[in-house]
UniProtKB/Swiss-Prot annotation:
One of its GO terms (biological process) is proteolysis. Its EC number is 3.4.24.-. It is a multi-pass membrane protein. Gene3D superfamilies: Metalloproteases ('zincins'), catalytic domain. This is Protease HtpX homolog. Its main location: membrane. Coiled coil: none annotated. The keyword Nucleus does not apply. PROSITE patterns: ZINC_PROTEASE. It is found in: Cell inner membrane. It comes from Chlorobium luteolum (strain DSM 273 / BCRC 81028 / 2530).
Length: 291
């Protein structure tokens, strides 16, 4: 969940900055100078949407380290760190990947993988995960994260987010223009849009962005099943991954970070639509039924 959450937050921030910069440069004024030019607007939305998404991807590893306080293991200082490095190295070799950076951060049981490409990636595990699981289970979690890198999930997420961003920016400005035109219906509409357009376009971007995250989260849940299967393939046995998921499910939900509710520990109903992970029971069932 952490890698997806960080990506979405970074993406939203970048999009808002790019959109605001475009306003300062007069792009919106140009698009609406003779009525709303939908063709030009779509091109502008795609440029900002995909640009923001790829900027977020390039920043993903740096943001992850900064937000978690993760410490990259450059040289093992104890037996646990040595085991972590060797395990990730072996799994990466099996996955035909370059050795990713390996980091540890303080926190409740969790792990994530991120990075702009398969050759420039990061695998991070929390101290809580290392304390609460045995090594076979931790190896399965590491294999799951390596499988995310092998499957190119961050790049896939970036492309999906780029498409979503494009429609969010496009629709936000269409709705904002319509609202501004309605508010100014008794005035001279030959000039540039009024203050209603500037305020409402930002508001619509935020609201549509939150709603559009449902689409991104849906694809994220699908990729989790693939990463589970990939972990089983890398280890050569699905049982360690199943045991790791069961161990995660047995941990007191109160001891988990809030984002781990998305892994199926807690939550449901409408909130499940905003979850980046399927329920643990569904993931275990998928592994057990795999052949």
């Amino acid at each position: 969940m952490k890698r997806v959450f960080l990506f979405l937050i970074t993406n939203l921030a970048v999009i808002l900055v790019l959109s605001f910069s475009a306003r300062l440069l007069g792009v919106d004024r140009f698009l609406t100078s003779n009525g709303l030019d939908l063709g030009m607007l779509l091109a502008f939305a795609a440029l900002i949407g995909f640009g923001g998404s790829f900027i977020s991807l390039l920043m993903s590893k740096t943001m992850a380290k900064w937000s978690t306080g993760a410490r990259v293991i450059l040289r093992a200082s104890n037996e646990d760190e040595s085991w972590l490095l060797n395990t990730v190295r072996q799994l990466s070799k099996k996955a035909d990947l370059a050795m990713p950076e390996v980091a540890i951060y303080e926190g409740a049981p969790n792990a994530f993988a991120t990075g702009p490409s398969r050759s420039k990636s990061l695998v991070a595990v929390s101290s809580g995960l290392l304390r609460s699981m045995d090594r076979k289970q931790v190896e399965a979690v590491l294999a799951h994260e390596v499988a995310h890198i092998q499957n190119g999930d961050m790049v896939t997420l970036t492309l999906i987010q780029g498409v979503v961003n494009t429609f969010v920016i496009f629709l936000a400005r269409v709705f904002a223009y319509a609202l501004d035109s309605f508010l100014r219906r008794d005035e001279d509409e030959s000039g540039s849009p009024g203050i209603g357009y500037w305020i409402s376009s930002i508001a619509f971007e935020i609201v549509f962005g939150i709603l559009a995250s449902i689409v991104v989260m849906y694809f994220s849940r699908k990729r989790e099943f693939r990463a589970d299967a990939g972990a089983a393939a890398l280890i050569g046995d699905r049982r360690p991954m199943i045991e790791a998921l069961r161990a995660l499910g047995s941990i007191d939900a109160g001891k988990l970070p809030k984002e781990m509710a998305a892994s199926g520990i807690a939550g449901g109903g409408m909130m499940a639509l905003f979850s980046s992970h399927p329920p643990l029971e569904s993931r275990i069932a998928a592994l057990e039924s795999a052949r």
